[in-house]
């Protein structure tokens, strides 16, 4: 943890090991730098930025991952290569992932492969609810060209599962490559709880030091910053931020 002034000069710094519960390590580091600058000076802090590899660690360690339903929209196409075809078994097991295929999707020029089957999506929602899945990743063929089927699928799922149920849409995650976009979306859906816990812990640590009016950001893969709400929706955008966090 560091404190930097308006001229980008280092004012205070400390290093603390990552802890299993996230909160205690963040609190310890935060308290140390606040102690170094003093409570009066700390009241002048206007921005707080967190760079973390907690999401990366969760994938590597196969821990704390959401139970994911992977919904592929593309039948009768997309059956040649199964969902998560070359994933490590231990990662799939850690996510307790199950894949579903429903009719829908688009061609490269936006034409429908087939009409979106809302009945099939409602059946998926029933399984998700009954089997305790914690998030859904929706991937439709060529959704970066036309995202209508993904958005409608998400709307149907929320009608059945509740407005706040975590749903990832692949058109918001990746580009045209179908399998790459699907894989990234599934990982994003698996990281919702990790991202929420990390962000909430950071805000709680700030509050414990009386820093309740600061603007809070998290670092993302390209070295830029994103809001807390954005990070909670798209935790996949933090998994390669280790190197950019370390640039001095």
Please annotate each region the language model reported:
Residues 1-248:
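N-terminally biased helix-coil "hinge/interface" segments that flank
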């Amino acid at each position: 943890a560091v404190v930097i002034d308006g001229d980008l000069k280092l004012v205070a710094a400390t290093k603390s090991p990552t802890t299993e519960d996230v909160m205690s390590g963040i609190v310890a580091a935060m308290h140390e730098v606040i102690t170094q600058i003093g409570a009066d000076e700390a009241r002048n802090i206007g921005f707080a930025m967190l760079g973390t590899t907690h999401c990366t660690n969760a994938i590597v360690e196969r821990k704390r991952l959401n139970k994911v339903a992977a919904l592929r929209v593309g039948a009768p196409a997309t059956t040649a290569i199964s969902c998560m075809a070359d994933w490590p078994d231990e990662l799939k097991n850690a996510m307790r992932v199950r894949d579903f295929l429903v009719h829908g999707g688009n061609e490269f020029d936006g034409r429908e492969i087939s009409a979106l089957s809302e009945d099939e999506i409602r059946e998926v929602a029933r399984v998700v609810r009954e089997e305790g899945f914690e998030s859904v990743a929706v991937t439709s063929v060529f959704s970066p060209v036309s995202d209508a089927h993904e958005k409608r699928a998400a709307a149907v799922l929320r009608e059945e599962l509740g407005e706040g149920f975590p749903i990832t849409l692949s058109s918001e995650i990746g580009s045209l490559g179908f399998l790459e976009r699907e894989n990234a979306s599934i990982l994003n859906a698996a990281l919702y709880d990790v991202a929420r816990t990390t962000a909430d812990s950071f805000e709680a640590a700030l509050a414990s030091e009386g820093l309740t009016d600061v603007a809070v950001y998290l670092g993302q893969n390209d070295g830029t910053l994103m809001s807390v709400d954005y990070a909670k929706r798209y935790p996949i955008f933090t998994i390669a931020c280790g190197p950019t966090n370390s640039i001095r």
